[in-house]
Amino acid sequence: MSSEEGKLFVGGLNFNTDERALEDHFSSFGPISEVVVVKDRETQRSRGFGFITFTNPEHASNAMRAMNGESLDGRQIRVDHAGKSARGSRGGAFGSYERGRGYPRGGGDQGYGSGRYDNRPGAYGFGYGYGYGRSRDYGGRSQGGYDRYSGGNYRDNYDN
C-alpha cells in the first residue's frame, strides 16, 4: 500500500487553521501519519490548503465523504483524494478541480518561480493562465497592448 492512497487534499482552509487544528478535526476517522498546511515560502502564511495522510486508505475515504463541504474554523472546506490527476491530461491553466487540482505528488510549496504552470523561459508561473514574463511578454500581448478591453495603448494620453 502506498501512502498516496490514504492522502487527502483539503482546500478552502481558513488562513489561521494550522496542522494541529486540522488533525483535531480529522483524527476521529482513524490514525493519521502526516498533516501539512502548505505555507507561502516567503511570508510563512497559510496558502489555504493542506494535506492529511491516513495510515489506512479506507479511513481517508470515510473522512473525505464526511468532511467534504463541512465548515472548519468558519470556512467551508473541500476534501478530495490528493494526487489523483493525470499529469498530461489537465484541462486549462487550473488543472482539473475535481481530480485534486493538479497539485504535484509529494505536495510541498514550489513557489511562484517554479514554472510549474508556465514553462516558457522568463515566465513566473502563477498558474492563472496569464504568464506574466520578465521582459516584454505580457500574456501573449506586446507591451503596447496594456489594456486589451480599452482598445488603446497605455501610453496614448502621455506620449502625444
Curated annotation (Swiss-Prot):
The modification Dimethylated arginine is found at residue 105. InterPro entries: Nucleotide-bd_a/b_plait_sf, RBD_domain_sf, RBM, RBM3/CIRBP_RRM, RRM_dom. The modification Asymmetric dimethylarginine is found at residue 105. GO terms for cellular component: cytoplasm; dendrite; nucleoplasm; nucleus. SMART domains: RRM. Interacts with RPL4. Associates with the 60S ribosomal subunits. Cold-inducible mRNA binding protein that enhances global protein synthesis at both physiological and mild hypothermic temperatures. Reduces the relative abundance of microRNAs, when overexpressed. Enhances phosphorylation of translation initiation factors and active polysome formation. This is RNA-binding protein 3. It comes from Capra hircus.
